[in-house]
Amino acid sequence: GNVDPRMLTNSTKSDFRQMLTYLRDAGAKEIGEYFPNIPFDDPLNLNVFRQIEEFGFPLTFHIAPAIGGCYGVFDELGLPRLERVLREFPRLIFLAHSQPFWAEISRDVTEEGRRGYPTGPVTPGRAVELMRRYPNLHGDLSARSGYNALTRDPEFGYAFLEEFQDRLYFGTDIANVPQDLPQVPYFRKLKVERLISPEAFEKITWRNAARLLGLPQETAR
C-alpha cells in the first residue's frame, strides 16, 4: 500500500488512520515505495511516519538527490535527514532503496556519484554507519542501485551481507516478469561457491521478508 503526505488536508494534522486501516484490512503488509518529492524530515512526512509507526507497517523509501526533476524523498549528501527520522521513529522499520542511499555505502561518494552507480573499492560510508547505529534501518537490495552496492567491491559485498544478514532483503524492484534481474545469478553464485554462509543466504533471499511480513516461515518459500 502507499500514502502521500499531501493527501487529505495537505497539513501536519492530516489523519491517515482510516486509510491505513483500509490498507491493513485489505491485506497490505508494507507501505511503499514511498517517494513524495519533499524533504525527508518535512513535517508532512513526520506526520505520516508517526501514524505508520503506530500501525506497525514497515516502509520502503526512495531517496531523491534534489527537489524537482526527480521523484523520492529529498536528502543531502551524508543523509542527515534520514538519520533524524531513524532517531525520531525507532519502532518504524525503514527499508532503504535507490541510488542516493546505496551510493553512500562508500565514504568517497560525491554529489554527482550519488545520482548514479559509483564503481571501485568501498571504504565503509554513511549507509554502513547508519545501519550499525540504527537497528530500524534495513536494506532493500533490489534494482541496479542495490546490486551495484554489493558488487562494486566483491569482498566488501560478502562481508556486508554477513554483517547485516538479519536486515537485508532480496527484491525485484518492480513486478515485471521479463526484466533483467542480475541479483538472481549473483545470489546463486553466492550459494554455489559458498561466498556467504548458508544462514545468511536463507535469511536474505526469503526468511527476513517472511518474518517482516508476518508469513509462516515453513510455507513462505
Residue positions per predicted region:
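Residue-level "edge-of-site" marker
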Residues: 36, 65, 204
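Conserved beta-strand termini and adjacent loop/short-helix elements that scaffold enzyme active sites
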Residues: 2, 97, 142, 206-207
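Ligand-binding grooves and catalytic loops that recognize ribose/phosphate and carbohydrate rings
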Residues: 14-21, 25-28, 66-84, 183-196, ...
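Conserved, mostly hydrophobic/aromatic
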Residues: 23, 52, 139, 173, ...
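Catalytic pocket-lining loop regions of alpha/beta-barrel enzymes
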Residues: 29-30, 42-170, 178
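Mid-domain alpha/beta scaffold segments of enzyme catalytic cores
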Residues: 1-47, 51-55
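Mid-to-C-terminal alpha-helical segments outside catalytic/metal-binding sites
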Residues: 164-169, 175-221
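Short, surface-exposed amphipathic charged segments that create phosphate/polyanion-binding patches used
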Residues: 13-21, 154-156, 216-220
